[in-house]
């Protein structure tokens, strides 16, 4: 099986900025044989799949809540284009449950309007499996260096799309 045999997974990504202009990042749980296994760069923003027939903005709000418990947000911006990444060749057939060559993502930026007490990652709300074991607010420019290397270029595009939101 080669990457060309597989589709991209349609996904959303969510950048949440606090009032100080810092971005919410979660430290991924690296469980078993996944695309995160063995990488020290495990900090990422919330993201997830778009369900069949689901509006991407609705998917972004759903994924944000399922992964973090965050609901108190206001929409700031949408990235102008879809952003994608490819899995490295050694993860084809393994990462993303073996079904995809990478992800094609629609990114949204939100302002966090709530209190940090609403953030719940372990366990997250609704009986969902935890995806993160820690979280923190990070400067936007640090995000590409905090993610697994094969997602770095995508994160550079996300930062470029939303850098105007930081004061």
Curated annotation (Swiss-Prot):
GO biological process: nucleoside phosphate metabolic process; ribose phosphate metabolic process
Keyword Hydrolase: yes
GO molecular function: bis(5'-adenosyl)-pentaphosphatase activity; guanosine-3',5'-bis(diphosphate) 3'-diphosphatase activity
SUPFAM superfamilies: Nudix
Motif mapping: Nudix box: 48-69
Keywords per UniProt: Hydrolase
InterPro entries in the cross-refs: Nudix_hydrolase, NUDIX_hydrolase-like_dom_sf, NUDIX_hydrolase_CS, NUDIX_hydrolase_dom, RppH
Enzyme Commission number(s): 3.6.1.-
Cross-referenced Pfam families: NUDIX
Cofactor section: a divalent metal cation
RNA-binding recorded as keyword: no
Name of the top EC class for this enzyme: hydrolase
Domain spans labelled Nudix hydrolase: 7-160
Family: Belongs to the Nudix hydrolase family. RppH subfamily.
Function summary: Accelerates the degradation of transcripts by removing pyrophosphate from the 5'-end of triphosphorylated RNA, leading to a more labile monophosphorylated state that can stimulate subsequent ribonuclease cleavage.
PANTHER family tied to this protein: NUDIX HYDROLASE 26, CHLOROPLASTIC, UDP/ADP-SUGAR PYROPHOSPHATASE
Name by which UniProt lists this protein: RNA pyrophosphohydrolase
Organism, as annotated: Rhizobium meliloti (strain 1021) (Ensifer meliloti)
């Amino acid at each position: 099986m080669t990457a060309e045999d597989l589709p991209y997974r349609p996904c959303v990504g969510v950048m949440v900025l606090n009032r100080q202009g810092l971005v919410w990042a979660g430290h991924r749980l690296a469980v078993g044989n996944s695309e995160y296994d063995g990488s020290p760069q495990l900090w990422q923003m919330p993201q997830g799949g778009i369900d069949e027939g689901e509006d991407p903005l609705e998917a972004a709000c759903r994924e944000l809540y399922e992964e973090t418990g965050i609901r108190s947000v206001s929409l700031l911006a949408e990235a102008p284009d879809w952003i994608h990444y490819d899995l490295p060749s050694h993860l084809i057939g393994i990462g993303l449950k073996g079904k995809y060559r990478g992800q094609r993502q629609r990114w949204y930026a939100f302002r966090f309007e709530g209190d940090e007490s609403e953030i719940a990652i372990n366990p997250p709300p609704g009986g969902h499996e935890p995806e993160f074991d820690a979280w923190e607010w990070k400067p936007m420019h640090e995000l590409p260096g905090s993610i697994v290397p094969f997602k770095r270029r995508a994160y550079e595009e996300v930062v470029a799309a939303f850098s105007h939101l930081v004061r």
